[in-house]
A protein has these predicted regions:
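Alpha/beta-hydrolase fold catalytic core
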Residues: 1-54, 78-79, 118, 293-295
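Conserved HGGG/HGGXW glycine-rich cap/lid loop of the alpha/beta-hydrolase fold
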Residues: 39-91
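Active-site loop/oxyanion-hole signature of alpha/beta-hydrolase fold enzymes
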Residues: 69, 82-123, 286
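Flexible "cap/lid" loop of the alpha/beta hydrolase fold
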Residues: 133, 137, 144-175
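Conserved alpha/beta-hydrolase catalytic His-Asp/Glu region
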Residues: 157-159, 176-232
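Short beta-strand/loop motif that positions the catalytic acidic residue
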Residues: 234, 240-242, 246
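Short alpha-helix in the alpha/beta-hydrolase fold that links the catalytic acid
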Residues: 236, 250-258
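Catalytic active-site module of serine/aspartate enzymes centered on a nucleophile-bearing elbow/loop
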Residues: 264-295
């Protein structure tokens, strides 16, 4: 059986699910590229060019359009919405070299400076929330306001060790089989109904723009992230949006982050899980828009 499975993996066609009903792309937003040093980053923009910018920062394993295609259009009537793919994500540059979340923040700061977009309201989801915190810490000129969704300041030590082991096992499995995180991510979002059946092919293709080593480098950077020594000194207004049923970033971690921030407002999404940007776009967009008006 093992030999047959290996032969099929080597010589058989790649697995692709059946896509029904007729398929479409959910948000056909044209992108351009910006160089920061020698690295090239994909940037997409929409909304009035003279409006205040809102930068939507995506999470681990996704892409800017892949995670914000439901929230972004709801903000674009009144704001200049900016989306950037991180290194190793979406259509931006790849690297297997080790890096830190601080490096992703430096990348984003370089993009904002190149496009003359600072200061901006920076909205970070999941890993993007860690990047947004580092951006406000390392490049305070770039951030007018922070919105943090489904994110944290640090991992508890025991959880960090467990997730580091799991990350190594996932990387090994993906190297051996070619199957892993993209498939599980796409299937989960489809199974929960977070992504409409019409966009299933797009989701499948979007999640497969990665490789095991690049994905692991991003995962390990996130596991090393710890903002607790300095997050309490961030001198910007912050909104923390907490999915109350978050299965990946436990809500107590999110409340702990909020407790460190000196100027913070809270919004709780009572029935939301970690995939809140897909399932609760109207609530999130409204919270962001009202926060920008108030602060």
């Amino acid at each position: 059986v093992a030999v047959a499975a290996a032969a099929w993996r080597l010589f058989g066609p790649p697995y692709t699910p059946r896509f029904r009903p007729p398929q479409s792309h959910p948000w056909r937003l044209r992108g351009t590229t910006v160089f920061v040093g020698d690295r090239e980053f994909l940037v997409r923009q929409t909304g009035p060019v003279d409006a205040e910018p809102i930068v939507l920062v995506h999470g681990l394993g996704g892409s800017s359009v892949g995670e914000w295609y439901r929230v972004g259009p709801l903000l674009a009537d009144d704001h200049r919405v900016v989306l950037v793919d991180h290194r190793n994500h979406g259509l931006s540059a790849r690297t297997t070299e080790p890096f830190e979340i601080a490096d992703l923040a430096d990348d984003l700061a370089g993009v904002l400076r190149a496009l003359d977009l600072e200061p901006a309201t920076v909205v970070g989801y999941s890993m993007g929330g860690a990047v947004a915190q580092e951006l406000a810490h390392r490049h305070p000129w770039a951030v007018r306001r922070l919105v943090l969704i489904g994110t944290f300041a640090t991992h508890p030590p025991r959880v960090r060790r467990i997730r580091q082991i799991i990350t190594g096992m996932i990387r090994a499995w993906e190297r051996l089989t070619g199957v892993g995180t993209p498939e599980s991510r796409a299937l989960y979002l489809r199974w929960t109904g977070a992504v409409d059946a019409r966009h299933w092919r797009w989701l499948w293709e979007e999640t497969h723009r990665r490789d095991p080593d690049a994905g692991a480098a991003s995962s390990w950077a996130l596991l090393r992230f710890d903002s607790t020594p300095w997050v309490g000194r961030l001198a910007v207004p912050a909104l923390v949006v907490i999915p109350a049923r978050d299965q990946l970033v436990p809500p107590p971690w999110q409340y702990a982050l909020a407790s460190h921030l000196p100027d913070v407002e809270l919004v709780e999404l009572p029935d939301a899980r970690h995939e809140a940007p897909w399932t609760h776009p109207e609530t999130i967009a409204t919270a962001i828009g009202e926060f920008v008006k108030r602060r």
